[in-house]
Amino acid sequence: MEADNYKYQRKELELKALLEITQAINENQSEEVLITIFKFTCLVHLNISSLIFYMSKEGGFERRISHGVKTKTPAILLKEAIEEDNGSGTLSIQLQEGYSFSELETYLPVYHKETLLAILFLTRKSKTQDLDIDFTQALANILVVALENKRFSRRQVEQEVFKREVEIASQVQQLLLPSSLPDTEVLKAKVTYIPHSKVGGDYYDLIRGRENKVYFCIADVSGKGMAAALLMSNFQAALRTLLRSNADLETIIHQLNFTLFDTTKGDRFITFFLGEYDFSTKTLRFVNAGHNPPLLFHQQQKQVEYLEAGTTLLGAFETLPFLEIGKRDQLNDFTLHLYTDGLTEAKNPLEEEFGEKRFRDFVEKSQFPDPKEFHYEFMKVIRNFSQDAPLQDDLTLLSLRFH
């Protein structure tokens, strides 16, 4: 009779334990609350005096509960330190010197579809009273599955947030880029833009100025995603404001650098090339701020030169250490090719880069003065070189033909 009463009382306690943990799960309690309830449920309703509970984490198992244990136990169990036999449920754990589970009587591995998700170490309160190992293991399994479901739901939410962020960043970027480029008797323009991912870090623009001037630029911002898109959006707004104020190139570059450094405190930077062409004086002025040097191709002479004069990249220093404004006079009938490093760093299956020399050779030998024809033929060359090898970065090529 006494034995029957004991069994009844034990089953009643187990039922209470089960109800407490399932009720907390149904109420969508936080991970910490669920773990705390599990801990006190084991200590109050089950024949357990001390326990340690490890849950799977990337690279190993993290200690989430430790109660009633005086010896030093590791906060993390590395996966490579655990040898498991799912069939027998036995584990062999290699501990570093100074750590021990000697105080604990037994351990219960918790599996889900042959994957070890948790380990429960415990000691009974009374050696004369039984501990239902199967029930304790089942209770731990319920907790672990609930926590895994929470993790899965959280990852889904994070993925949705990231997906939405990428979509917004992509929309922001599209708004930054010009919707059309000139195709007139005095200026023809063509751009090829191939982002490495949905949101690239390249930016280009062509802006009509006052007094027969036109401004053109290309930039590459460090980083990707929403942060890079917003940074470039602010950069473009500052650039256009300065151009509308009719500021000279020196003032524009210094102000852009100050604004960028003030915003990012040196954590982000932008490589940038800005050019200004005056149709009335046939003068080209430019600044290269750490960007790939554009190619200036003189159509009549069939000569190529790099436009390198300028300064360091923007945003790295509070004050630019030096600044040189490049200038070319009496320019007429010429083409400018502005590009980002995604072009020269494009690789073939042998991991060889396309490089600046191949691009310069193509420009020098080009028989395609029209930018559209030039881009069509050049993209055939680079595709033939890469043989469908994936791009390493965003690829942007902006070609401007001046007559």
Residue positions per predicted region:
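Helix-loop-beta substructure at the N-terminus of cytosolic sensory domains
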Residues: 19, 24-65, 182, 266-268
